[in-house]
Amino acid sequence: MELDTTHISVLLNEAVDGLAITDDGCYIDCTFGRGGHSSVILSKLSDNGRLIAIDRDPTAITAAEKFKDDKRFLIEHQGFAALAEIAEKHELTGKVDGILLDLGVSSPQLDEAERGFSFMKDGPLDMRMDTSKGQTAAEWLAVADVEDITWVLRTFGEEKHAWRIANAIVDTREETPLTRTSQLAKLIKTTAPQREIKKHPATRSFQAIRMYINSELDQIEKALVASLDVLAEGGRLVVISFHSLEDRLVKQFMKKHSQGKKVPRGLPISEIELNKGKKLSLVGRRLKPSQTEVEENVRSRSSVLRVAERLERNTD
């Protein structure tokens, strides 16, 4: 199968600007994808600069071969939850000038029916980011009980009809195994009323199952926490989210670590003491794609970019 390289990086310039790149700096692209952001980062680095990319999708590792002769670049085939371990392996803990996280599913993953991410194309019900390991969506749906399926649909998809859909899945699999995306999409469409005119009834359920299969929120949380140790003082953390669950997690993390100690009013405490515990400084406001970008790439419409800067460690 020919590798699909048609992915358009969302908020490309805004994300790279947020990194505030210095030509001899060290950066980590936690979601290489097809290398859109990495290409621009490399174009801004001198021979002394360095870029480490991370991706758990085998097709992304293949796509990274275009940089194999660039001594400034290397890629690690892992999930970005391993950020701390990767930085330690390369002796970069506390030395990285910028970390980029571009969350969600890439266009090639959605467009390739065999990956099983899309309800718009028939394919095997897989949904794994890393196809070399782990449980597929079909395998999980074959054994999960109604309560577990309901919890996943509600927690990761905010699906109001979760119980109804979960019951339909369990009832259906007793007669016919659910192994194809088209089967699941049709089942959901006939089970749950359409909530939004422009949104397929299966949208939230597919998102929820994908996020559960890939432990996406857990991966994000681990990477965010690791970034505090991996970043150098003044290093930038840039995160692009694509739905409210991701963005809420990022927003709360950045807010938490950009605030100092909470103390009662009126106490005679110095500014240094008040700032103790602050690890991040928020950089600007959240950014959304321009109307032009949305028109050129409709998948960018829900994206949100947030930036924070690592503070001096004597305030930790």
Curated annotation (Swiss-Prot):
The record lists the catalysed reaction(s) as: cytidine(1402) in 16S rRNA + S-adenosyl-L-methionine = N(4)-methylcytidine(1402) in 16S rRNA + S-adenosyl-L-homocysteine + H(+)
Residues the entry annotates as binding S-adenosyl-L-methionine: G35, G36, H37, D55, F80, D102, Q109
Cystine pairs? none
- The name of this protein is Ribosomal RNA small subunit methyltransferase H
Q: Name one GO cellular component term.
A: cytoplasm
Alphabetically sorted, this entry's keywords are:
Cytoplasm, Methyltransferase, rRNA processing, S-adenosyl-L-methionine, Transferase
Q: What is its EC number?
A: 2.1.1.199
Q: Which GO terms describe its molecular function?
A: rRNA (cytosine-N4-)-methyltransferase activity
Q: What class of enzyme is it?
A: transferase
Name one process (GO BP) from the record.
Answer: rRNA base methylation
The record's function comment reads: Specifically methylates the N4 position of cytidine in position 1402 (C1402) of 16S rRNA.
The protein's location, in the record's own words, is: Cytoplasm
Q: Which family does it belong to?
A: Belongs to the methyltransferase superfamily. RsmH family.
Query: Which Pfam families does UniProt cross-reference here?
Result: Methyltransf_5
According to its UniProt entry, this protein's organism is Colwellia psychrerythraea (strain 34H / ATCC BAA-681) (Vibrio psychroerythus)
* Taxon lineage: Bacteria, Pseudomonadati, Pseudomonadota, Gammaproteobacteria, Alteromonadales
User: NCBIfam families annotated for this entry?
Assistant: 16S rRNA (cytosine(1402)-N(4))-methyltransferase RsmH
